[in-house]
Amino acid sequence: VGNSGTILTSSDGTTWTSRTSGTTEHLYGITYENSTFVVVGDNSSGSGTILTSSDGITWITRTSGTTNSLWDVNYGNNKFVLSDGAGGIQSSSDGISWTSRVGIDTYGIWGGAYGNSKFVVASVWGYIFTSSDGTSWNNVISRSANALNDVVYENSTFVTVGVNGTIQTSSDGTSW
């Protein structure tokens, strides 16, 4: 996914095909689970962008319920969880209908991941938040004085990355 509604698909990772997304918004995050792709993006039209697809070819616009840009989307604990540029969190069991959750940081959540039975999201102000259910969130003060851009979970380790070369690791999402 990328600028101006760009969605590319590939069956081999070498040859890529451009797909019609139905939007000109910049797209920032994508995840796939339960036979559903969910893509999130910008809000220049007045609403954060959510697109879904069962095949990666045909895309349907969904209602986001927010005027904020949507930065990332993840799946875990039987639900999709997305974050927005103003710290809002939404969750969905199907990627189609979304429920707003209590905002966790007024300065924006840029990236997140699911692993070790919890969601972990990172903020532009260097804070990290965790949730086991995608609904109730705990603030974990990170050691970073820098903006954090994303979180991944692999090999039993969460990794955050941010500006000025910031990299932090955690096995539990709480101690960094």
Model-derived regions, located:
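Residue-level hotspots at or immediately adjacent to binding/recognition sites across diverse folds
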Residues: V1-W176
